[in-house]
Amino acid sequence: MREIIQGLLFVALGSVFGGMARFWLSGMVARRIGETFPWGTLTVNVSGAFAIGVFGALAASGHGVFSTPGPWLFAVTGFLGCYTTVSSFALQTLALARDGESLRAISNVTFSLVFCLIAVALGFAAARVLA
């Protein structure tokens, strides 16, 4: 029971920081670039994909910070789980499509998929080089 409560606390704490980081970064990007395209959400999701690539590579190595469950629960389940957002991506894409912005909607799907996959691969590679 103690491990479950401890795990919940790691996830909760990571979620608080992940949510605040998402709010700040997404808003900052939207204010600087504009809101005609969901650049803030795309930035958050791509940077989150890079981070999970790094964390995944560290976990796959079998040693280091992710050799115990606490850091993974905090960083991946909590922080990145709250930081990245598929639901906002889906809502913004639907809004673009419903507003007759089909090209922007398709671009959002394409950019998100391609850039997030590239970011995960780059994060994984960066962690391997640094390890």
Curated annotation (Swiss-Prot):
Localization per Swiss-Prot or TrEMBL: Cell inner membrane
TM region(s), chain numbering: 4-24, 46-66, 71-91, 105-125
Residues that hold Na(+) according to the record: G81, T84
Domain of life: Bacteria
Catalysed reactions, semicolon-separated: fluoride(in) = fluoride(out)
One Pfam family hit: CRCB
InterPro entries: FluC (IPR003691)
The entry's keywords: Cell inner membrane, Cell membrane, Ion channel, Ion transport, Membrane, Metal-binding, Sodium, Transmembrane, Transmembrane helix, Transport
Record-level Gene Ontology MF annotations: fluoride channel activity; metal ion binding
Activity control: Na(+) is not transported, but it plays an essential structural role and its presence is essential for fluoride channel function.
Record GO cellular component, one term: plasma membrane
Membrane topology: Multi-pass membrane protein
One of the protein's GO biological processes: cellular detoxification of fluoride
UniProt keyword annotation of Nucleus present: no
Family the entry assigns: Belongs to the fluoride channel Fluc/FEX (TC 1.A.43) family.
Stated role: Fluoride-specific ion channel. Important for reducing fluoride concentration in the cell, thus reducing its toxicity.
PANTHER family, sorted: FLUORIDE EXPORT PROTEIN 1-RELATED
Protein name, per record: Fluoride-specific ion channel FluC 2
Naturally occurring in which organism (per UniProt): Rhodopseudomonas palustris (strain BisB18)
